[in-house]
Structures are given as C-alpha cells and as structure tokens.
Amino acid sequence: MVKVFFVLAVLSSIISYINIDPMKSSFFLIFSLLFSMPVISMSMHIWFSYFICLLFLSGIFVILVYFSSLSKINVVKSYMAVFLLLLSMLYFSPTVLTYSSYLGLSGFYYSIYWFIFCFILVCLLFFMNFSSYFLNFSGALRKV
C-alpha cells in the first residue's frame, strides 16, 4: 500500500512538472503532497509528516499568489518527464524503516532525514526554476 501511495505521488508530481498552467500545476503538487504523507508518516515520527505538510502548503500558496496573476506563459515541451519518472521510481522507491534508537525529538537532527531534506529541497528548486523559465521571464518575483 505504501508503494501505491509513492507511485501516485510521483505521478502527480510529474504531471505538475509537465502542466503549463500554474493553477493546475499547484493543484497536482498538492495531490503529490497528500499522496506522499502516508509514505513519510511510516517513518519514526508522525509529527515530521505534519511539519512537511505545513511547510509545503505554505510554499504552494505563495506560488499561487505570485504565478496566478501572470498571463504570459511560454509553452515548452518537456522531454525529460519520462526519464524523471523512471529515475524516481527506481531510485526513490520507499522502504519501511524501523528504528528504535532515534525515538526522541533529537532524532530529527541525525542523518535519517538528510536524504528527505535534500530530496524535497531539490524538488522545490527544480519546480521554481522551471516555473520561472516557463513564464517567459516575465517576473516571478516582485520588482523593487
């Protein structure tokens, strides 16, 4: 069941990468978050999945505020979507980890979650990079 949620999360994130409309792309990113929460909550700490959920949803709503008012969208075909889908299915497939030594809050700072931190950071950086590229350099950030 965990692998089904993982496959659905990866598929919805790939669809958000392919989709050009910022509203639909944010919608599919929210779906990918909802499908990845059972996978993350199967680890040691349940509070960590809620923490990721709050941070990710606040970022999605910031993306909606900045990008939904922009009307010039440059259509670019994405040929890397199938490669990214296969790479994420092969490399990031979930395994249920059972640790009993890191049950405290201090386990948050150890090397267990560094992979998850780096993966989420890379996904968000790629999304922001390609979203600003697809918007035809019309200004994804506020001008001073």
Curated annotation (Swiss-Prot):
It is a multi-pass membrane protein. It catalyses: a ubiquinone + NADH + 5 H(+)(in) = a ubiquinol + NAD(+) + 4 H(+)(out). It is an enzyme of class 7 (translocase). The keyword Transport applies. Changing V39I: In strain: AB1, AB2, CB4852, CB4853, CB4855, CB4857, CB4858, KR314 and PB306. Coiled coil: none annotated. GO terms for molecular function: NADH dehydrogenase (ubiquinone) activity. Its main location: mitochondrion. It comes from the Eukaryota. One of its GO terms (biological process) is mitochondrial electron transport, NADH to ubiquinone. Belongs to the complex I subunit 6 family. This is NADH-ubiquinone oxidoreductase chain 6. It comes from Caenorhabditis elegans.
